[in-house]
Amino acid sequence: MSILEKWGKALDSRNEDSMNDCIHDDYKFTLHSAGKVISKSEAIAWGMSGDISRDKVRILFENDKVGVEHAIVTFNDGNTQAVLSFVTFKDGKIYTHETGASNLPK
């Protein structure tokens, strides 16, 4: 199973131990729309919160250095976005994560 497949399974099942195993300790998630960067613990807390519901997930590319994934993501506030994720890997774990998102009509 690929790193992104493991991450997706952990996120979708809200398995904190598995999320922790997938993410590098020096992980950084850049949230361009909010103008901030969140850490591993913040990303796991967000994943565990139930705010993220993913559908139609497709891994577009993945090798041992980078991965690209697309998904339709619905948030608890009712907003739905088409999200393109770019991740880098280090030591077999997700090291950096950036997303680009387009709002979808409700």
Residue ranges and their predicted role:
Residues 13-28:
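Short, well-ordered alpha-helical segments enriched in acidic and aromatic residues
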